[in-house]
Design a protein with these regions (language model features):
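Short Pro/Gly-enriched beta-strand edge/turn motifs at strand-loop
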Residues: 44-51, 117-121
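A cross-family detector of function-defining hotspots
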Residues: 127, 135-136
Length: 168
């Protein structure tokens, strides 16, 4: 039986689907001291492609990225469109939606996932300054009780829409 070798990598990110990303960030900062949070709008033109079950889609999500130690926390507010996030909210409510694994080569990781029997539910990419960066959510919940996201980080990121707390 083939297995997904990317699962032998460390978890780099924990992703939460939240109702209001600004309020959630404020709570993390005020109650736990977690910050600085970098906000991005995941929609075109930042994302160069967006697919849901293999078909092009449009969605808009407000994302905040922060760190708890070495682990990146991603807070996601679905603003518009049918996505894996709205699927999660319908099934589970708000909360931990995925675990993210950083991969050096997305093509190789996706081939590995397919060999192990996993397909891409939703993906997007092109969010780096050089048009690189790619994320792909896999249909792992059926076996692992959570969705795994493969993340090939961009070499350089765009400046965030905002940072919380604001720099003095």
């Amino acid at each position: 039986m083939a297995y997904a070798s990317f699962l032998n990598r460390s978890i780099g990110q924990i992703g939460y689907v939240v109702e209001n990303v600004e309020e959630t960030v404020k709570g993390y900062y005020e109650k736990f001291g977690i910050g600085n949070w970098h906000f991005y709008t995941y929609a075109p033109p930042l994302l160069k492609f967006q697919n849901y079950y293999g078909k092009p889609i449009y969605y808009n999500a407000r994302i905040a990225l922060g760190y708890f130690g070495d682990t990146r926390i991603e807070l996601i507010q679905n603003v518009e469109g049918q996505t894996i996030y709205t699927d999660f909210i319908k099934s589970h409510g708000y909360g931990v939606q995925h675990l993210g694994i950083y991969v050096p080569d997305m093509g190789e990781a996706l081939r590995d996932a397919a060999t192990a029997g996993y397909s891409v539910v939703m993906e997007g990419g092109g969010f780096g300054l050089d048009g690189d960066g790619h994320f792909a959510y896999l249909d792992t919940e059926k076996d692992c009780d959570i969705t795994y996201e493969l993340i090939q980080r961009p070499k350089r990121r765009h400046e965030p829409d905002m940072i919380y707390p604001a720099k003095a």
